[in-house]
């Protein structure tokens, strides 16, 4: 029997919606990365993008454990000398919670050419509203929430 190798047309993409209310950021990111890569499917192939679309709502209500809210810092660089900027996750979640979730998910995707393609299937929204009701997303439950 020959080994099955999936073709690009074999990708059966579904839409999932995740409510980030009181979900720990790292746990949310790891489940999201698994869905984006397609590792939950029996047709997973590491060299192809077989993943699903993921919608994350209520990004502003995501939780961080311990003292990470004040001590963990998010960095970015302008490209100019002395252009390193940093801010705590408390400031980042207050100003741009979508960026905080995208940054966590991006860190859990592989560092190769497929990462940008997989990350483009991630849709993050600050509040509960999203424009993807026509795609009929299925609710994806994450078992543990922050206490």
From Swiss-Prot:
GO terms classed as biological process: negative regulation of translation; translation
CDD domains cross-referenced by the UniProt entry: Ribosomal_L13
Keyword Nucleus included in the entry's annotation: no
Pfam families: Ribosomal_L13 (PF00572)
Entry GO CC: cytosolic large ribosomal subunit
Gene Ontology MF terms in the entry: mRNA binding; structural constituent of ribosome
Keywords: Ribonucleoprotein, Ribosomal protein
Gene3D superfamilies, alphabetized: Ribosomal protein L13
InterPro entries membership: Ribosomal_uL13, Ribosomal_uL13_bac-type, Ribosomal_uL13_sf
Family: Belongs to the universal ribosomal protein uL13 family.
HAMAP family in the cross-refs: Ribosomal_uL13
Subunit-structure text: Part of the 50S ribosomal subunit.
Function: This protein is one of the early assembly proteins of the 50S ribosomal subunit, although it is not seen to bind rRNA by itself. It is important during the early stages of 50S assembly.
Name assigned to this protein: Large ribosomal subunit protein uL13
Organism per entry: Micrococcus luteus (strain ATCC 4698 / DSM 20030 / JCM 1464 / CCM 169 / CCUG 5858 / IAM 1056 / NBRC 3333 / NCIMB 9278 / NCTC 2665 / VKM Ac-2230) (Micrococcus lysodeikticus)
Lineage of the organism: Bacteria, Bacillati, Actinomycetota, Actinomycetes, Micrococcales
